[in-house]
């Protein structure tokens, strides 16, 4: 079946002052004062657009499908009082994902989207149009969506539009970065932040992870491994983290030669707590000044973001402690998470200085961000191109600086790349791409060429890395499960990596799936490198696909997950995503539609979710107990 002609309408909060409708090439842009900006763009065909009073006329000039599909994305912030309407039927955008992702489906003539302030954009369509209102969180995509199907025989049609401005304006966030909704632990006064300092010190001390282990006869070495297990299991002391197998169990071994299970926390230095305020500054009750101690709340390490991306979490640390320093904040949080049994930083830490200062193991990711990628294969470079290979080698020169660091566990190659697209994408490239020329010269089918491509890709990286750093581990690409479930990819990667990493989000562990990946990679150990559960109603932020009723239930879900991981015998670590809740108005690099979930162990006001921490502490005690 042919693809539908897709016209994308992207909705973003607060991008303009005064309603405006205009064209940008083949795009139609509706800019609303605070409700958003809608962009209509033909993606798989061409249309001629013309303006009329309160309307846009469409004429299809090139159709590559048998129907026209329009998709209107609505960002997650609309759970804060936003509403949808199709003709006379209407409803709220739900706070939590329901059993049915379809909020509406049926024929109609008119749709509307209304934000929390009452600003409303109404769009009218031809007779016979079919609509779906969809909750994309069903597929881990943090948006709502209008799907609009125009009858196939309609080649010319008119879309009408109207806009109703708000009467008054509500704020999306208070001065502490909190949404208007009530939730447990919400603060109303700066004095509460200052009072938290003493009470939280007492709470973290009460977790007493090391003391509880000691009462069980277990002592940790300086790296967090279980003292004495090296002698017990005959593990080697190499001065660096490495992997060994004894019997049917794989061990991550710390530099002192003891068994170590990687209990990591991702985004340790923050990042997802930043939000982009550009064009919607008036949606916030307060934004930090750019001078004085609050200047540290802005992302000042990158000039582009220095006046755009801000963290209310960091501003709250200024209120709470008097100042904010990136390294010192990370050192403080290392001491905290150690009390719950976490023993290392996960991916996206960006605070290796703090790790060294606190003697805390960490992982890193290769700096491949500036390397040219194949556009139709997300995150994957062309390994046949000599200049690209040279760029990869130059990027890996940076690993020499940490080659002798015993705290560094190893490197992730990248994150959630689309290797499954190789067979489709390479034949569609033009001959300017070296990979396309290599495919043509091979005379192989696209499916058969995938193995050649992957072998080249992994060989380039492994050879360059091992020559520069022989001491640390190659920890895989942080595959999504849909990517990992591929025999060819697993087999080739297994020849070059030390461990496989899977960003494995799941309510229940599919043991057959992870065992299949293990077998296909030739028996490589695994790190489940990204997962979390949310309790949206007991937090400042929204619910994730895997949402539970309470913070206590989050801790219980964590416990079930890590218990399953340890029981596999070949899983040597897990990484919870993230340390700090994502910004309620969307993490900065994704704009206003960015992820905004209850990911954190800490809220925007630096308050620990105490029931979660206690549950995690209890689960981590059991994990370490399996190593003795």
Go through each PLM region and give its residues:
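Active-site clefts of carbohydrate-active enzymes
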Residues: 309-316, 372-381, 443, 480-481, ...
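Active-site groove signature of glycoside hydrolases
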Residues: 395-451, 475-476, 571-578
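Aromatic-rich peripheral "rim/lid" segments of glycoside hydrolase catalytic domains that contact
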Residues: 428-438, 577-628
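Substrate-binding cleft of secreted/luminal carbohydrate-active enzymes
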Residues: 406-410, 414-416, 531, 546-602, ...
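Sec-dependent N-terminal signal peptides
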Residues: 3-14
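Active-site-adjacent substrate/metal-binding segments within catalytic domains
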Residues: 196-355, 375-401, 406-407, 447, ...
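Glycoside hydrolase catalytic-domain groove-lining segments
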Residues: 448-463, 467-544, 559, 563
């Amino acid at each position: 079946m042919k693809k539908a002609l897709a016209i994308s309408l992207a909705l973003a909060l607060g991008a303009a002052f005064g309603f405006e409708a205009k064209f940008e090439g083949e795009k139609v842009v509706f800019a609303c004062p605070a409700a958003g900006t809608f962009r209509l763009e033909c993606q798989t065909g061409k249309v001629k657009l013309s303006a009329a009073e309160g309307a846009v006329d469409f004429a299809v000039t090139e159709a590559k499908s048998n129907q026209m599909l329009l998709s209107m994305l609505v960002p997650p912030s609309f759970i804060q009082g936003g509403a949808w309407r199709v003709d006379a039927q209407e409803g709220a955008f739900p706070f939590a994902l329901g059993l049915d992702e379809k909020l509406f489906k049926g024929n109609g003539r008119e749709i509307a989207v209304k934000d929390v302030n009452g600003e409303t954009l109404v769009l009218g369509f031809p007779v016979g149009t079919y609509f779906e209102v969809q909750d994309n969180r069903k597929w881990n995509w943090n948006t709502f969506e209008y799907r609009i199907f125009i009858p196939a025989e309609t080649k010319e049609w008119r879309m009408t539009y109207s806009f109703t401005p708000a009467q008054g304006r509500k704020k999306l966030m208070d001065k502490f970065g909190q949404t208007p909704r009530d939730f447990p632990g919400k603060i109303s006064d700066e004095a509460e932040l200052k009072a938290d300092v003493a009470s939280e010190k007492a709470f973290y001390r009460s977790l007493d992870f090391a003391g509880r282990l000691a009462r069980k006869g277990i002592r940790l070495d300086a790296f967090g491994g279980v003292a004495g297990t090296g002698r017990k299991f005959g593990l080697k002391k190499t001065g660096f983290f490495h992997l060994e197998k004894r019997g049917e169990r794989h061990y991550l071994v710390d530099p002192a030669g003891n068994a170590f299970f990687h209990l990591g926390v991702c985004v340790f230095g923050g990042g997802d707590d930043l939000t982009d305020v550009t064009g919607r500054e008036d949606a916030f009750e307060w934004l930090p000044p750019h001078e004085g101690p609050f200047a540290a709340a802005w992302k000042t390490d990158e000039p582009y973001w220095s006046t755009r991306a801000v963290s209310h979490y960091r501003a709250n640390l200024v209120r709470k402690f008097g100042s904010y320093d990136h390294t010192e904040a990370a050192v403080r949080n290392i001491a905290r998470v150690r009390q719950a049994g976490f023993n290392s930083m996960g991916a996206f830490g960006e605070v290796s200085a703090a790790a060294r200062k606190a003697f805390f193991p960490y992982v890193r990711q290769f700096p491949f961000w500036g390397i040219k990628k194949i556009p139709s294969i997300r995150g994957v470079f062309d390994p046949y191109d000599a200049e690209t290979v040279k760029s990869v080698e130059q990027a890996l020169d940076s690993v020499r600086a940490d080659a002798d660091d015993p705290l560094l566990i190893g490197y992730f190659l990248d994150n959630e790349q689309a290797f499954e697209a190789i067979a489709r994408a390479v034949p569609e490239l033009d001959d300017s791409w070296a990979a396309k020329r290599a495919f043509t010269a091979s005379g192989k089918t696209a499916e058969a060429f995938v193995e050649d491509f992957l072998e080249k890709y992994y060989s380039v990286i492994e050879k360059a890395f091992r020559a520069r750093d022989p001491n640390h581990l190659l920890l895989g690409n942080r595959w999504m499960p849909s990517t990992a479930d591929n025999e060819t990819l697993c087999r080739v990667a297994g020849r070059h990596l030390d461990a496989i990493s899977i960003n494995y989000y799941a309510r229940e562990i599919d043991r057959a799936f992870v065992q299949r990946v293990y077998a296909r990679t030739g028996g490589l150990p695994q790190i489940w490198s990204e997962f979390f559960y949310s309790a949206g109603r007991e937090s400042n932020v929204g619910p994730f696909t895997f949402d539970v009723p309470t913070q206590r239930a989050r801790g219980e879900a964590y416990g079930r997950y890590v218990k399953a991981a340890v029981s596999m015998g070949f899983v040597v670590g897990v990484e919870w995503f993230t340390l700090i809740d994502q910004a309620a108005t969307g993490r900065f690099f994704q704009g206003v539609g960015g992820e905004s979930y209850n990911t954190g162990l800490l809220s925007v006001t630096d308050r620990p979710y105490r029931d979660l921490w206690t549950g995690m502490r209890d689960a981590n005690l059991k994990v370490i107990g399996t190593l003795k």
